[in-house]
Amino acid sequence: MTPTRPSVVVSFSEAGWRRFLAADRPRPNLLIVCASVEMEAVVSRVMSLCQGPVHARQLPGELSLPEELTGTLVLWDVAQLTRGQQMFLHDWITVRPPDAQVISVTTAPLLPLVEDGQFLEGLFYRINVVSLVARLGEGRADSQADTRSDMERQHAGSARFRTR
């Protein structure tokens, strides 16, 4: 059976994004799939919108996470994690402190990697997939009409997530 995960569609207006990041405890883990967008711009913008301390890790590289982490951990590019790093992150997310939130950014769709056994299925299901509907890296240029149209298309489509 092919694993599927429905996308959560988010309007990336600053006010909407702040409300989404300030969700009820425990705060959700997020995966932002951003094809055709500069990943650094997305990471920079997400970090500027997060409340509280922000810890950033560029991957691949050493993945060391403090046990007492609070605030937001931003990881990029999560598709490049080694199998050992995936297992470490999965275990950390499972018992993470309630005040910590993990936001991962990638340009590679993870579902094909899960299907090929290159990405840990358990970690994939612990990350909520968020499709990039607006141009987060381009500031306030997103329009409500475009976002509404994208949301309607997403909800009318299949349950598999898509990169945009």
For the regions a protein language model found, what residue spans apply to each?
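Charged helix-capping and loop-helix junction motifs
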Residues: 115-119
